[in-house]
Amino acid sequence: MDLKTSNSPVIADPLPKLALPSAVMTYTTPTSFPSTGLYLNTPKKKPLPGKIEEVRAAGWLDLMLASSPPRKRQTKDFANDVQADELDLLYRNWVVNHPSALTSFEDIVNLARGKRLALFLDYDGTLSPIVDNPENAVMSDEMRSAVKHVASLFPTAIISGRSRDKVFDFVKLTELYYAGSHGMDIMGPVRKSDSSGQHVECIRSTDSEGKEVNLFQPASEFLPMISEVYKKLSESIKDIDGARMEDNKFCVSVHYRNVAPHDYGEVHQRVTAVLKNYPCLRLTHGRKVLEVRPVIDWNKGKAVEFLLESLGLCGKEDVLPIYVGDDKTDEDAFKVLKANSIGFGILVSSVPKDTDAFYSVRDPAEVMEFLKKLASWKEEST
């Protein structure tokens, strides 16, 4: 992404027309997929020696331990204060390269003038706080009001790892577009007549208000397999204290936020033991969660591209997409915007992280403040 001296992203070449694959193979394909289309090429590997497997498991354990910032300290002592001061310094240095979207709001406004904004939002950790029980990740009424307000001014979509139905139950706003299961289950607008032809995997449907929408589910052939794996994993981890399963329709989440750290390795071992018989599925990690997904070339970044095209905003020089998210899975969306120089990402984090987002905010409270400022600017400028 090109930068001005004021550290604002400059939109260069527009995004090329999205060329989506036209066919999806069934999940029964045994071990590999063609190099073209949605499927990732994953030839069957020879078994690795025990030592290498131990290293691989150790690497996953490190990721699991590092996947979420530590809990706030309940007591004060000198060592903790020194550590906090060091982290504070690291964060201040990090913000130089990923400036606050609030303190840099004028730069964002200057960039947005004369452009049509499209807003993409993660849910957990972005619109709602991260909580011990994922079923309790409820957004506040004030946040819902802020999201409703911006959605009345800009096309707005929620792109979440949760199932689409579940995230809608949390948000409860019909003004939005929803992409669940990391973009593998999208309810988007019916394409404009001047855009490219209807994608073959889109299903014409209606939403809860009777409005015509398109459903796009590129991993639909995997549903029987995902359901089967969910049952096996539920049985496998049921005796690990604190482990929790979540069925997100096109992916399965194994939450270990409430698991004792000494049991992290056991969680990983049991999950991988089940998955070894499913080469068409892959394991990824997020914030205190292991996620099982189909091996297809689809993610939140692809979902952003799909929605932009569905909205008739793809390849337009006067369009500015903004993506706000907090998790590793949101990096796919940040990368798409950065690589194509068409917009920018805002990372929600109070600790320094490697990211392709240009701006940052600390927490959902700052996300809400940013949304309110964005809505106020739009109304004042029209």
Curated annotation (Swiss-Prot):
Expressed in roots and shoots. Removes the phosphate from trehalose 6-phosphate to produce free trehalose. Trehalose accumulation in plant may improve abiotic stress tolerance. It is an enzyme of class 3 (hydrolase). GO terms for biological process: trehalose biosynthetic process. The keyword Metal-binding does not apply. Pathway: Glycan biosynthesis; trehalose biosynthesis. Keywords: Hydrolase, Stress response. Its cofactor is a divalent metal cation. Induction: By cold, drought, salt stress and abscisic acid (ABA). The keyword Lipid biosynthesis does not apply. Belongs to the trehalose phosphatase family. NCBIfam families: HAD-SF-IIB, T6PP. Its EC number is 3.1.3.12. It catalyses: alpha,alpha-trehalose 6-phosphate + H2O = alpha,alpha-trehalose + phosphate. One of its GO terms (molecular function) is trehalose-phosphatase activity. It comes from the Eukaryota. This is Probable trehalose-phosphate phosphatase 2. Optimum pH is 6.5.
